[in-house]
């Protein structure tokens, strides 16, 4: 007999997310994690302070793990402070590859430098199965190529694909667990990933095969905006940047920062930083 299950995920979004799901499954134990996206920490004056406040919140909330959804920081010595801050959290920590993480590196270099298990991977926490996807692939109609060292500044129609190998892995990974599943990606599979419809079909097919609402949530970043939507029973949540909104026009940054700061951080010229993360 069906009963209502209350699945609780506590997120660093200024809200407690409660999902009521009809299922025959047992009631899951709560999992608490702190999530952020698009720090762009080396590119803004207070990147260290923003990341520090995130880590402080994770400690205060006694999170089970933390995760960032890409466009985090670089691998050079100047970014060492961000790596040290991130690694100061004593529990599990996870990264997602963002497009700008591929501005100076190959995926192999970045995965190794960030101590990631792979460019896409999965892990379990309590009664939940979490999946990290990688949408940083080019496809010109002939072949798939991963973003690497800024090679993706080409026709926008070629960008943001999930490669076939990853799609097959996703099918097998979903089928291998009976836990409820939550996905993370930099680009949104509901709007931005070019073959997102195919990815969503995999998720929906698995829900149908499993006979219960197995895939419940998919988080993304990249667009520096907030929204949530439901597509065929699966909730998609976009996480805003922890740092700024890109406006793609002069932002009058000279009214907000001194000249030497604007010279050091040219990104400020076309963006508006948030007061706090």
Task: Please annotate each region the language model reported.
Residues 1-29, 207-208:
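Bacterial Sec-dependent N-terminal signal peptides
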Residues 23-81:
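N-terminal active-site segment of His-dependent metallophosphoesterases
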Residues 33, 66, 130, 181-182:
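Hydrophobic beta-strand anchors of alpha/beta hydrolase catalytic cores
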Residues 38, 70-71, 98-99, 186, ...:
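Active-site glycine-centered loops adjacent to acidic/histidine catalytic or metal-binding residues
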Residues 78-171, 175-176, 198-215, 225, ...:
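Extended active-site neighborhood of metal-dependent phosphoesterases/phosphodiesterases
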Residues 172-191:
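Short acidic, glycine-rich surface-loop motifs adjacent to enzyme active sites
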Residues 183-189, 216-226:
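Histidine-centered catalytic micro-motifs
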């Amino acid at each position: 007999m069906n009963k209502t299950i209350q699945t609780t995920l506590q997120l660093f979004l200024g809200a407690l997310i409660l999902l009521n799901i009809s299922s025959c499954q047992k009631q899951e134990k709560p999992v608490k994690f702190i999530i952020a996206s698009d720090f762009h920490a080396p590119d803004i004056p207070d990147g260290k302070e923003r990341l520090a406040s995130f880590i402080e919140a994770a400690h205060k909330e006694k999170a089970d793990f933390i995760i960032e959804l890409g466009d985090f920081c670089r691998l050079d010595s100047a970014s060492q402070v961000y790596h040290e801050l991130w690694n100061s959290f004593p529990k599990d920590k996870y990264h997602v590859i963002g497009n700008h993480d591929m501005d100076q590196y190959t995926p192999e270099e970045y995965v190794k430098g960030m101590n990631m298990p792979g460019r896409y991977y999965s892990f379990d926490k309590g009664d939940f199965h979490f999946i990290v996807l990688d949408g940083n692939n080019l496809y010109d109609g002939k072949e798939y190529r991963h973003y690497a060292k800024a090679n993706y500044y080409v026709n926008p129609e070629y960008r943001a694909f999930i490669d076939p190998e990853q799609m097959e892995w996703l099918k097998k990974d979903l089928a291998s667990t009976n836990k409820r599943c939550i996905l993370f990606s930099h680009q949104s599979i509901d709007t931005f990933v070019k073959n997102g419809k195919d990815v969503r079909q995999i998720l929906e097919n698995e829900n149908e095969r499993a006979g219960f609402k197995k895939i419940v949530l998919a988080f993304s970043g990249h667009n520096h905006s907030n929204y949530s939507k439901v597509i065929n029973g699966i909730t998609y949540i976009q996480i805003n940047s922890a740092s700024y909104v890109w406006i793609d026009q002069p932002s009058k940054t000279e009214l907000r920062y001194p000249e030497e700061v604007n010279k050091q951080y040219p990104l400020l010229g076309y963006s508006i930083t948030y007061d706090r993360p």
